[in-house]
Regions:
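Cytosolic regulatory regions of ion transport systems
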Residues: 1-67
Length: 67
């Protein structure tokens, strides 16, 4: 199993996150919009609200550790 970080949960990002999760992959989804995070939270391994343009946020989720 691989681990994926999906940044941005608009139509495309949410679809990617859902498909990866359905394929049995570990998915951390990140978006600045709380509604997008809430929508996807029960469909992925973890969903976090945060600004992906903030390096501290990316470090805190361990962005370098994903496939």
């Amino acid at each position: 199993m691989k681990s994926f970080l999906v940044i941005g949960l608009g139509r495309f990002g949410a679809s990617v996150a859902q498909e990866l999760s359905a394929l049995g992959q570990e998915v951390l989804a990140l978006d600045i919009d709380a509604e997008n995070v809430q929508y996807i939270s029960d469909q992925v391994t973890q969903a976090i609200q945060g600004d992906a343009q903030d390096e501290a946020v990316l470090r805190s989720v361990g962005a370098r550790n994903f496939d």
